[in-house]
Regions:
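C-terminal alpha-helical "lid" subdomain
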Residues: 227-244, 367-487
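Short coil-to-beta transition motif at edge beta-strands of beta-rich domains
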Residues: 1-11
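Conserved NTP-binding/hydrolysis module of P-loop NTPases
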Residues: 154-175
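Walker A/P-loop nucleotide-binding motif
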Residues: 108-129
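The catalytic "switch" region of P-loop NTPases
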Residues: 60-66, 242-420
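Conserved P-loop NTPase mechanochemical-coupling segment
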Residues: 192-270
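A short, basic N-terminal segment
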Residues: 15, 19-20, 25-29, 37-38, ...
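Conserved catalytic segments around the Walker B and adjacent sensor/switch elements
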Residues: 133-152, 380
Length: 487
C-alpha cells in the first residue's frame, strides 16, 4: 500500500518519496521536485537483505546528482557535478589534492600545467577536474576549447571573449554566487573604492575608462543597451559604439579607446586577463584560473597565424609562471598603449592547458614560435596515462556499489558484493589484455556503466551469470579481442 512517506519508483521519473495521496493521484517528490502522478504507476521500493542501504533523509539530491553523473558516464562525457566528478574519477582524491596544493602556492610559485596525451587519455576530464577543485577552493575559472572558427588564438580578442564568457564563480560565505561577467560588474560597482586604485587596473585604458563610464548608468539586466555596453568590456569589440553613446548621454565625456582586434594583439588581451585577475583578488576571490583545451589546433595554421597564436601563448604562459630574465620582450603591434611590463612581474593568473601529443611537444628547448612556448620547465608537463589494472578494478567495484545504492530497485542485483567483484574482475581481465597505447579510458569507464544500464532497461529478471556473460562479451569487443559480427 502506498501512503505518505513511502519510497517508490516511477518508470519515467525514477525514485521518489510520497508526500500525499488523494484518491488515485499521489504527490511524489522526485529529486527535489514535487509531481502529481497516478498512484497505480508507482512501485514501492522493496529492500532485500542484501540490498544496499536506502539513502538517508536529505540525500535525495545526492541520488539525483549521481543519476546525472551515471548518464554522463554512459554517454562518454564529463559529469558536471563537482563532487561527483571527483568521486567518479579514477584516483580522483589524489588528483584533486595535487591540484589544490598547486593552487595554494600559486601566488609565489606560479601554476602552468600542460596536460598531454593522445585521444581518449583524459585531458578534457582532467581540465574539468581542475575547474571543480579551483571553484571549490575559491578561484574564479575561465574555460574554453580553442576553435579556429570561434576562439582562435591567432585572434586573441576571440579567446578573451570566450574566456570571459565562460567565467564561473565560487559561492560566497553568505551563500550568494555571481553568475557571469555581468554580475561581476555589479560586484565591481559595489566595491568601486577598492577597485579603482588597483595598479594594473589604473593602467588599463579599457577597464578604467570603461568602468568609469558604466558608473554613469543604472546596472540593469533588462536594459539591452546597458547589457551591450557591458559586453564591450567582455570582449564584444563591435559594441564600442554602445558604451560610448550611452555613457556620453549619461554625462561621461572621456574618450573610451577601442579594443583592437587586428594584427598582433596578444599583449593587450593578456594584460586584460591580468587586470581581471587583479580585480578578482581585490574582491576576495583567490584569483583567476584559465583552463584552455584543444591547444593543438594551431599546428594547422599558416605561418603568420601560427606566430601570432604562439606569441599569445607565450605571454599568457609568462603570466602564469614566476618571472624569467632570459626572455625577450613579447611582440606587439600596439605598443603606443604604454602598458607596464606585466609579463615579468608575475606570477598572475594560473593556466591549465589540454594538448594532444605531437612532434612539437617532445623537444622542450624549441625556440619562440613553437608550441613549447607554454613550457618553461619539464614539471609543467603532465603526461596522462591510463590507470593500472588494480586501480581500474577497484574503481569499477566502487562505481557498481554506488549504482546499487542510488539507481533504484531495478539494479538491486548489484547489491551483491560477490557479483560486483565478478564484474570488476571480468572488466579488469579485458582491460589488462588491451595494449596500454590503445586503452581509451572513456570507453572503459562507459563499459562499467553497462551492467546497471542493462538492469535498468529490462522489465524481466536478469540473473547474475547472464549479466556477467553480457559484460564479458561487450568488454571483449572494446578490447579488440573480437569483431562485432563474430560469434
Amino acid at each position: 500500500m502506498i501512503v505518505s512517506g513511502t519510497q517508490v519508483e516511477h518508470a519515467e521519473y525514477g525514485i521518489g518519496t510520497v508526500l500525499a495521496v488523494l484518491g488515485d493521484v499521489a504527490t511524489v517528490e522526485f529529486f527535489g521536485e514535487a509531481l502529481d502522478v497516478v498512484a497505480g504507476e508507482l512501485m514501492p521500493r522493496q529492500q532485500s537483505k542484501q540490498a544496499a542501504p536506502p539513502p538517508a533523509r536529505g540525500q535525495t539530491s545526492t541520488d539525483f546528482a549521481f543519476r546525472k553523473s551515471f548518464e554522463a558516464v554512459n554517454l562518454g562525457v564529463v559529469p558536471t557535478d563537482p563532487d561527483q566528478l571527483v568521486d567518479l574519477t579514477i584516483g580522483g582524491e589524489q588528483a584533486s589534492d595535487e591540484i589544490g596544493s598547486l593552487l595554494a602556492n600559486a601566488s609565489e610559485d606560479g601554476v602552468c600545467r600542460i596536460f598531454m596525451g593522445y585521444y581518449g587519455s583524459g585531458k578534457s576530464h582532467h581540465l574539468h577536474l581542475v575547474k571543480a577543485v579551483a571553484i571549490r577552493d575559491g578561484w574564479v575559472t575561465a574555460s574554453l576549447e580553442l576553435d579556429p572558427k570561434a576562439a582562435d588564438p591567432a585572434k586573441p580578442a576571440t579567446v578573451y571573449q570566450g574566456l570571459v564568457g565562460g567565467l564561473e564563480f565560487p559561492m560566497r560565505a553568505d551563500g550568494s554566487r555571481s553568475a557571469d561577467f555581468f554580475d561581476l560588474i555589479k560586484e565591481i560597482r559595489d566595491n568601486w573604492s577598492v577597485v579603482r586604485d588597483l595598479p594594473y587596473f589604473k593602467r588599463s585604458p579599457w577597464f578604467s575608462k570603461g568602468l568609469e563610464a558604466l558608473l554613469y548608468l543604472s546596472h540593469r539586466r533588462d536594459d539591452t543597451d546597458y547589457v551591450a555596453a557591458v559586453s564591450w568590456l567582455a570582449g564584444q569589440v563591435k559594441q564600442i559604439g554602445a558604451i560610448r553613446s550611452l555613457s556620453w548621454r549619461g554625462g561621461h565625456k572621456t574618450q573610451i579607446p577601442i579594443l583592437p582586434q587586428t594584427k598582433d594583439t596578444g599583449l593587450i588581451y593578456a594584460y586584460n586577463l591580468v587586470v581581471l585577475h587583479e580585480i578578482l583578488k581585490a574582491l576576495g576571490y583567490k584569483g583567476l584560473a584559465l583552463i584552455i583545451d584543444e591547444a593543438e589546433h594551431v599546428r594547422s595554421y599558416s605561418f603568420n597565424r601560427y606566430i601570432r597564436a604562439n606569441n599569445f601563448f607565450d605571454i599568457i604562459a609568462r603570466c602564469a609562471h614566476a618571472p624569467r630574465k632570459d626572455l625577450q620582450k613579447p611582440q606587439s603591434d600596439y605598443e603606443h598603449f604604454d602598458l607596464p611590463p606585466f609579463w615579468k612581474e608575475g606570477p598572475h593568473f594560473t593556466l591549465f592547458v589540454g594538448l594532444t601529443e605531437g612532434e612539437d611537444t617532445h623537444d622542450l628547448k624549441r625556440k619562440m614560435g613553437e608550441m613549447s612556448v607554454l613550457i618553461h620547465d619539464p614539471k609543467d608537463v603532465v603526461h596522462l596515462e591510463p590507470p593500472c589494472e588494480s586501480d581500474y578494478e577497484k574503481w569499477c567495484e566502487a562505481f557498481l556499489a554506488e549504482s546499487a545504492g542510488r539507481l533504484g530497485p531495478k539494479v538491486q542485483l548489484l547489491a551483491d558484493p560477490g557479483l560486483r567483484a565478478r564484474i570488476a574482475a571480468t572488466l579488469r581481465h579485458h582491460f589488462d589484455q588491451t595494449p596500454v597505447s590503445e586503452r581509451i579510458l572513456r570507453n572503459w569507464t562507459k563499459i562499467a556503466g553497462f551492467a546497471p544500464a542493462v538492469l535498468m532497461s529490462r522489465d524481466g529478471a536478469t540473473n547474475s551469470d547472464e549479466l556477467v556473460e553480457l559484460i564479458d562479451e561487450a568488454a571483449r569487443q572494446i578490447a579488440g579481442e573480437m569483431l562485432p559480427w563474430d560469434d
